[in-house]
Amino acid sequence: MFEQICDINDIVPGTGVCALVSGQQVAVFRPTEEEAVFAISNTDPFAQSNVLSRGLIGEHKGELWVASPLKKQHFNLATGVCMEDERFNVKSYQARVNSGIVEISA
């Protein structure tokens, strides 16, 4: 089941926002001008803080990552895998844009 989050144009390209999905903080990212979005848990497992939506988006070896604004670990936007230590992955969510509306799988 997908929850409607916001209009795609509410997310500035190259940034992320935080959304509440089924009671969980989810970081939703729009890496480019295109209507492609990614969603992972907003909780940085290293800092135990809800900050990943404010991280910087980058690309490494053809994959998109977000760097935590606190301790700078990198998390894969598609899978939630931590580049520096795979023991500290974050949950990834199915995300899509449907008729201009961002939707996240609950």
Per-region residue spans from a language model:
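Short amphipathic
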Residues: 2-7
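Rieske [2Fe-2S] iron-sulfur-binding domain
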Residues: 18-106
